[in-house]
């Protein structure tokens, strides 16, 4: 696995979380590859969740950029999905995005009912919200993005998805969506929030909801992506080991890592 670099990001909104912060390390141990850990933000006189989170995003950008420069495939293991901004920026070239998630992560400060920053990750990546904080980070045109297997969205989020014409797909329609995306981009960032899995298969976190993908469906989706695109970087996010007492998620993560970079990850 010498061509893969695992980039652990064990920070939840810029801070340590008693359960979620363990997730990246557990996944890294299961996958087994060269690993770096992204440092947390410098302490501030007055804690600032947003500023701390963007500090982490920029640290991810640096770690991914270094991996690419070293000829390594960057596989990010993160708590928060908004780390995707750092990953795409670190790759340093135009990419499409394929986003697997039970949720849309497509809110902005104007649409969110909760103010939860990680519920805005995909929206920020496609150019909406927090413009000043995003300075110097890349955005991806929404028409170069696909949201897969999302099934738990608030009404205001659904309205935003429709207004922005974000392409959505499920297990039955994802190949057609990938075909359309392949007419626009050659390389993609693949984002897998592990709660895309149906909780009957494995419960990734407390936000897991029924109606998700099984492992075979997710493997088939990744094979379809490999057949159409270069995968420039990928992420596995939002794993809470306290919700997975049987240890199913790390085993699945190994399978997914092999599908994401089959020529780079040993069997």
Features from the language model and the residues they span:
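Cofactor-binding loop segments of dinucleotide-utilizing enzymes, especially the Rossmann-like FAD-
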Residues: 9, 100-102, 127, 150, ...
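A short secondary-structure junction signal
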Residues: 108-111, 133-136, 156-161, 201-202
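Catalytic cores of soluble, metal-dependent hydrolases
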Residues: 2-75, 87-90, 158-267
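Active-site histidine-anchored catalytic micro-motif
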Residues: 70-135, 144, 229-232
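Phosphate/diphosphate-binding glycine-rich loops and adjacent basic-rich segments that engage nucleotide
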Residues: 134-155
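Catalytic metal-binding/acid-base residues of hydrolase active sites
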Residues: 82, 103-105, 151, 195-197, ...
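Active-site flanking residues adjacent to catalytic metal/cofactor-binding acidic residues
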Residues: 7, 79, 100-102, 148, ...
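Internal, well-ordered alpha-helical segments in soluble enzyme and binding-protein domains
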Residues: 23, 118-121, 141, 157
């Amino acid at each position: 696995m010498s061509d893969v670099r695992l980039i652990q990001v064990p920070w939840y909104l810029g801070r340590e979380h008693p359960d979620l912060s363990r997730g990246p390390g557990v996944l890294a141990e299961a996958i087994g590859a060269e690993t770096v850990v992204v440092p947390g933000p410098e302490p501030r006189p007055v804690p600032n969740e947003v500023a701390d989170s963007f500090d982490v995003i920029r640290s991810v950008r640096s770690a991914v950029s270094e991996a690419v420069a070293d000829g390594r495939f960057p596989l990010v293991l993160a708590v928060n999905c908004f780390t995707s901004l750092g990953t795409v920026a670190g790759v340093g070239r135009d990419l499409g995005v394929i986003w697997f998630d039970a949720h849309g992560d497509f809110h902005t400060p104007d649409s969110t009912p909760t103010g939860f920053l990680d519920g805005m990750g995909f929206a920020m990546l496609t150019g909406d919200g927090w413009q000043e904080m995003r300075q110097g980070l890349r955005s991806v045109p929404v028409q170069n993005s696909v949201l897969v297997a999302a099934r738990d969205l608030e009404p205001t989020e659904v309205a935003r998805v429709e207004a922005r014409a974000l392409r959505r797909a499920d297990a039955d329609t994802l190949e057609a969506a990938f075909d359309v995306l392949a007419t626009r981009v050659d390389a993609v960032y693949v984002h897998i929030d592990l709660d895309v899995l149906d909780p009957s298969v494995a419960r990734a976190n407390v936000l897991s909801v029924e109606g998700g993908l099984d492992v075979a469906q997710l493997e088939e989706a990744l094979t379809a992506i490999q057949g159409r695109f270069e995968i420039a970087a990928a992420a596995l996010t939002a794993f809470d080991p306290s919700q997975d007492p049987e240890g199913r998620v790390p085993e699945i993560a190994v399978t997914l890592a092999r599908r994401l970079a089959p020529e780079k990850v040993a069997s």
